[in-house]
Amino acid sequence: MANVEETVANVQRKIDREKALINAANAMRQSTNNPAVLSRLDGQIKDGRRNIDYFESKLRDLDLQRTTSGVDNMSLQPGRSPTNPLTPPPKDNWDGYAQQDQGGYGGPQSQYSQLSGGEALQPPRAPFAAPPPATANKRPNYSKLDLIKYDTPHLGPRIQLMLTQLEFKLSVEKQYKDGIEKMVRLYQMEGDRKSKQDAEAKRIESNQKIQLLKHSLKRYEDLHVDIDGDGDDNDSLDIPSQRKPLSGQLSLRIHAVADVDHAATGRFSRGPETFVNIKVEDTIKGRTKPTRNDRWTDEVHDFSIDKANEIEITVYDKTGDHLLPIGMLWVRISDIAEEMRRKKLETELANSGWVAADKMGGHTGIQPDMQFQPPPGQSPAGGPGGGPTPAGVRPPGAPQPQTGPIMIDDWFSLEPVGRIHLTMSFIKNTGNKQPFDLGLGRKGAVRQRKEDVVEQYGHKFVQQQFYNVMRCALCAEFLKYAAGMQCSDCNYTCHKKCYPKVVTKCITQSNAETDPDEAKLNHRIPHRFENFSNMGANWCCHCGYVLPLGRKQTKKCNECGLTCHAHCVHFVPDFCGMSMEVANQILMEIKRTRRGQSSSGPGMSQRTLRPQSAAKPLPPTQPQSPGQPGQESPTQSDRYSYGKEQMSPPPGPPRQPSYPSSATSVDAARASYSTTGTASTGAPTSPTSGSRPPSGPRTQSSVAAAAAAMNKATQPGYGRSNTDYSPQSGRSSGSGYPTEQRMSQQQAPQPAAYDPSVYANIPSYPPSHQQPAPVPSYPTKSSYPLPQPPPPQSPPQHPQQPTPSQQKMPEQQALTQQPPSAVGEVPGKKVTPAANTQGTGKRIGLDHFNFLAVLGKGNFGKVMLAETKTTKQLYAIKVLKKEFIIENDEVESTRSEKRVFLIANKERHPFLLNLHACFQTETRVYFVMEYISGGDLMLHIQRGQFGTKRAQFYAAEVCLALKYFHENGVIYRDLKLDNIMLTLDGHIKVADYGLCKEEMWYGSTTSTFCGTPEFMAPEILLDKKYGRAVDWWAFGVLIYQMLLQQSPFRGEDEDEIYDAILADEPLYPIHMPRDSVSILQKLLTREPEMRLGSGPTDAQEIMSHAFFRNINWDDIYHKRVQPPFIPQITSPTDTSNFDTEFTSVTPVLTPVQSVLSQAMQEEFRGFSYSADFA
């Protein structure tokens, strides 16, 4: 409270000072008739009044903050704690809140939820519910270009932007001046008088620029008001991956300057000549003619730019032979491109009748089968009652594309004072430019390429191209729009030349990987980090990014002055008083000295337990490395990680010392399973701490088997087998288990008798499916096939008694199964089949098929229609070249795709594409899938617009497919019309699992940049960690496209689409039904934690929304609802529902010339599979 009072007094002093300046300017106006002086005084008075308005708005914010802090300390109701606020309303329709609380919409959810063995889940209430729309965060509708305009109403964000920009420009100009002074001294030593004079003139100009920058910086520092509640005003102002250099044609017209402080001249001499210099990346591109009236009539400059970031415009006064800079302006080229995109969109929407959701009227009527009415003068062209809408033709009433020239014409602020009138346009050079927003079309998915990882003391350095000004964490010098090295684990950032000098260990490295003899610096003085008011350009000493303004996210050491982000504090080593460069130099010298000494003792490689090699059991007293439960060392878990993704599983209990080696693996397994039930009955299991089963054994050694058994009962993640080498590979690894399990085991009664059926993840399985495997007498890392699940039917209530063949199963296979207690505790989390599951069906190969047609092509392969030679059954076969898989490091992603297919096969989900078989040849791998002859929804929506009923029907079936994936820990990440197939009975099947990610439960996150541009969620574009809520964002885009026959976010290329996703609000026809707008608004919420479906109940939130009020989910799941459309074919091999671009291609396998080595072929061992229903 004292800080607030102090800030209020400070703001009041600033208001008084501005008022005094305005009074002085008014007094001066009375004593002069000079037009130039009067114009300058008018500008000062206008600026002063604007500053007063800004300060008064900050005073109101402070008063509100003071009032809120007082209310927070009050108890609102008797007996209610201040820390237990009132229950907010749910994420659903705000106006329909009372209606939902009275029973929801139809209430069939409980019938469907029993299908997966769970209890009925209603939409979440507190604390998972979002606030009502009236209190939702408003996104500011401005760009960076808006902030540098003279009349911008966004003065607060402008102050933040200019403080950062001016501080950086000042530091760069000082470095430039130091370089010039060195040149002056060099030329003086050489006696080159002409070059010395030129350098001296540059030094004088640089000094003058420094004075301008200091003057401007002081002005903005005086205007800045530090309020704790201030955060970043706009997330899209600093997009780490999108502010990249651009190439194209720039047109710039300079009209006039005004309110500038001209150079002083003699009383009787003429005024100075004024001209403007235009620079692009320090290269002069144009210069205006000199003028004495601050105006130019025909100053148009057209020039091409190549991979440039910024334009610098400098206004000069020329007095005699001297040039004096009087005003400066910097414009990012990407900001010009973004402004032109927004203007183009605004022009299209001016008369279309489409508005943002918050501007919708009170249209509450529900139209039974809505077809949006076009504006007057246009005739409907799609849907029932109208002809089909051909591909590329815009839906009725949609905004029409703008084809005329778009120009930016405005007054922009000069620094430190003045303004300049500019007209600009920019045409990008893009190789993949497409017509702006002409309906829906096919677009391929993008995936972040796997980068070469360089490991340095636990850091996993990857080369990154930075489009912001970064600061090296080692040498503290800048990286200006350059490539650097960044650790993919902790985000430590440095120059490419500096990363070999880094010898401080990455904090994400576990203690087990620390060499006891590694070099250590006896300088353990922790920093005293505290919040500070960041008013200028300061950089994080760890990740290298510029710090935001304000106090919320910034820390500063009181002793040494080091600054960093609040979330980077725990990454900074305890080297207070010593720079990182000096610390690393000392550590390097220590290591060099030790390296020269005797190396008789064993090295690190002989002491560390490595997952790739067999390791002896640890002694009972030796604790294992702390870390996530069930998580192995980073070396193994990242070796085959899909897309180098950084998984963040839900938090769990810490590891404890491993089980004593005297216990056998079977005893450990028995004890763990027998105590799981008693340990779990004490308290309910939360969504983040529930059990989740691993998929395969890691070892046969007693210690590792015991640890794996114990982990299996409680660990949130599962350790999957990375490969399926023969037993001779001899790989093994150990893992710890949580405290609760060890304690419960010590208190357990006599272990239960060995019963394989208890450990199975299915109620029963046919005896014929079991193949007893011999138990080797040495540690192995071999994987055993899981029993094939039966077709979906009502499961028996009690497990059957094991047969003799089942009793002979090896202990390792028993350990791969899930205990019933884990299934009973969290019904939504199920066993994931191993990647090397062979299946139980008949083995097939390439000789069994004839290829008939090409059905589609993607970034990673092609899909062909094939029939079996004997039965003439039709299948769709996805063909991938092994050479491509290995070259692009896609081995693990191919395994992952197979595992996701097995998850879909497990219950034969009605809306997921099933896999019949996998096989391989020397050059290719093949996925044999069921053939869906109705084509995809992209083709059908191009033929004609969907009505509401049809879109709702498809959305409901897709929702159940995503629900099943999420219940099995899979996020889909590539939801789009192209990947939704239509069966001949009118139902859908979701296909293409190439971008799926496993082990993604509630609370888990990953960070790979992948997906189809129009469907990618903002958190993916912002390089943030994301969870399964990205699927619900894509679900919102999908519903929007099905209802309106166009995408909510449009652009000519991927960059424009990304900008639209981050900055634009989706638009809707003015008469669109309220329920449709509501679900889209809640699914297309940029904050993932506020998005519908982001809570622990996942799809249940969406299923209970008013948009699906008439849906009976049990009937949808069992296909008892009559589909609204039935596709037609003339024969079983008719491919008319597929794109002729693909079907016209001859279905042949192109020859592959390369020969893979034995080691490469070994990567695909165990890929073959055949389903029991094939």
Curated annotation (Swiss-Prot):
Catalytically driven reaction(s): L-seryl-[protein] + ATP = O-phospho-L-seryl-[protein] + ADP + H(+); L-threonyl-[protein] + ATP = O-phospho-L-threonyl-[protein] + ADP + H(+)
Skewed-composition ranges (Pro residues): 124-134, 648-657, 786-802
Residue ranges, compositional bias (Gly residues): 380-389
Keywords attached to this entry: ATP-binding, Coiled coil, Kinase, Metal-binding, Nucleotide-binding, Phosphoprotein, Repeat, Serine/threonine-protein kinase, Transferase, Zinc, Zinc-finger
Domain C2: 229-349
Disulfide feature: none
Family that this chain belongs to: Belongs to the protein kinase superfamily. AGC Ser/Thr protein kinase family. PKC subfamily.
The protein's name: Protein kinase C-like
